[in-house]
Design a protein with these regions (language model features):
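Polytopic transmembrane helical bundles with strong interfacial aromatic enrichment
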Residues: 1-138
């Protein structure tokens, strides 16, 4: 099955498109929520934006993760030897840990300096993840 992905002329590029669209959906919604937490759009309730935005971000993450796993399956040895891939995986783990901390402490209800700092760290981690993703090919 995975050999077919690697050899079919449209399969891998299609996975890349799904991966990029998933990342766009994830990051677009996270950035909107972060901007709201930092004070932009005060008329929009954070809880309402979070309910919709985090659901869409989860869909984006799922699409990016599923397509990423399929792309990984086509060349696992090469990717595991790639420093950019290794760093991307470490940053993904850090982003997940950061998100868990954010939600477990109830940051959406507090909207304090720690919540804003955690969201800023999240954005920086995701910028690093995207950058590493681009560097994997080089």
């Amino acid at each position: 099955m995975f050999a077919g992905i690697a050899t079919h002329p449209w399969a891998y590029p299609a996975l890349e498109v799904v991966h990029i669209l998933g990342i766009a959906l994830l990051l677009g919604n996270l950035v909107l929520l972060e901007l709201r937490v930092f004070g932009l759009g005060p008329a929009l309730p954070v809880a309402d934006l979070a309910r919709l935005g985090l659901s869409l971000a989860a869909v984006g993450f799922t699409a990016a993760a599923a397509s990423g796993l399929l792309m990984f399956a086509t060349q696992p040895a090469d990717l595991l030897a790639n420093r950019a891939f290794t760093l991307k995986m470490l940053l993904l783990f850090a982003a997940g840990s950061n998100a868990a901390f954010f939600h477990l402490r109830g940051s959406l209800q507090r909207l304090d300096a720690t919540a804003r700092g955690t969201m800023m760290v999240s954005t920086l981690l995701w910028v690093g993840i995207v950058a590493c993703g681009r560097w994997i090919a080089y």
